[in-house]
């Protein structure tokens, strides 16, 4: 909603004519080419309409690049199949070489204390049961020189310790009010499949 404002001014006609003539003179003065050189107006240039999504110049370049890579991979595969294998395969993409120095170079920023890395060794460990069955299992153990101040716990492997364990089990079985049964006997028949 636009509102129009009308003003009624009471101005003598002579004064009104003077104001109009002064305005016309100012317009003629600015419009005269001899007073000021006017810069040439450029014709109105319309902007290009925006390309639809996925059809712009960047998208077209990406699409062309992907097609070239795809064709390059296909051409390399065809070339490799026609050539006899020389032992070393050349990958189409550059991959890092798998040397220990390159793999661990990214890990240097993690530890800057200067402490040497802990070395791990695979050593067998033997576990002996009460029934004198011995199991030998592989175990990863850190080197003792790199373990800071960790006391080793003494392990009793003598026959006395086996006797102590057997005595403890027998006293536990005697103190229980129920008869000692095997785990299979206490299971329901449906679970055992009998």
UniProtKB/Swiss-Prot annotation:
One of its GO terms (cellular component) is chromatin. One of its GO terms (biological process) is chromatin remodeling. The modification Phosphoserine is found at residue 86. The modification Phosphothreonine is found at residue 90. Disulfide bonds: none annotated. It is found in: Cytoplasm; Nucleus. This is INO80 complex subunit 4. It comes from Schizosaccharomyces pombe (strain 972 / ATCC 24843).
